[in-house]
Design a protein with these regions (language model features):
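Phosphate-ester processing/binding pockets and catalytic centers
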Residues: 1-274
Length: 274
């Protein structure tokens, strides 16, 4: 999709999700989270060196969820603000009744439109909600980096190997890369910024690696603040430690996504595909 140029600073963004995007009553948490970690590619070796032992990056098996003790989760959260990284957390409240109503309506509406105009099957709710947290994390990460540094930058985006339908993977990933790049460069042009960004094709973290383990552990530690209160791993301490760094952010996007879905349905109703 693009050639990385030496004049462009190379930046890595890792993304993972936590929770199950479903409205079933037996879910472990009422929240679905997207978590991204961003850093300069030139700092990657330093970051992994500093976290290798505590994160168990070189262990035979990856640390995640129940394998991370409460005390280690706190230690990890204390280290993160000291590393040259930015963490963005995007949250959907699955217990919001109005949100449930709008998402279910959007799913039914979308199924009709997909079958009528594209002759394809409908999407489950999970595939509606996952792109929302992904887009919010990546967009905010790139915008923040651009505003702080104001230099030509190439973003290398890696996301967890989630259940994107096989037939949609190429379109899903390429369209998002192109969309991020066009939207942000359009904003830069509007405000007369003298720099631009490139977003490479989004890649899947479908094999074990330091990058996959690093983002997986951070997402697991963050998620503890969003578990049900009776869960033995529930704790707000790790999240508060992470947010002690002003560069890190937590965004509840429930209402924003709700309005977005309403707007999409309204627009599609007024301007149906030809």
């Amino acid at each position: 999709m693009m050639n990385l140029q030496n004049s462009y600073n190379q930046v890595v963004i890792l993304f993972d999700e936590q929770g199950t995007p479903t409205f079933r009553e037996d879910r472990e948490t009422n929240f679905f989270l997207g978590v991204s970690v961003m850093y300069d590619l030139s700092a990657e070796d330093f970051i992994f060196d500093q976290s290798r032992i505590l994160f168990g990056l070189s262990n035979t098996g990856a640390l995640r969820n129940r394998k991370i003790s409460n005390s280690r989760a706190v230690e990890i959260s204390q280290l993160l603000p000291e590393l040259p990284i930015q963490i963005v957390i995007s949250i959907l409240d699955l217990s919001d009744i109005e949100f449930q109503r709008v998402v279910n309506l959007y799913r039914d509406f979308g199924d009709i439109m997909r079958e009528r105009y594209r002759n394809v099957r409908g999407r489950p709710i999970a595939q509606i909600l996952h792109p929302q947290v992904l887009d919010d994390c990546i967009f905010n990460s790139i915008c923040d980096y651009s505003e702080r540094n104001q230099i030509n930058s190439s973003f290398l985006v890696f996301i967890d190997d989630w259940s994107i339908p096989v037939n949609d993977i190429e379109i899903y990933l390429e369209d998002r890369s192109r969309s991020f790049q066009e939207k942000i460069n359009s904003l830069h042009s509007e405000f007369n910024y003298g720099f631009e960004i490139n977003v490479g094709e989004i890649l899947l973290l479908n094999q074990d690696s330091y990058r996959k383990r690093f983002i997986g552990i951070i997402a697991s530690v963050v998620s503890r603040a969003f578990l049900n209160n009776d869960n033995v791993r529930y704790s707000e301490v790790p999240l508060n430690n992470i947010l002690s760094s002003e560069i890190n952010q937590k965004n509840d996007i429930t209402n924003k996504v709700k309005q977005l879905l309403i707007d999409v349905m309204d627009d599609s109703s007024r301007n149906p595909p030809l």
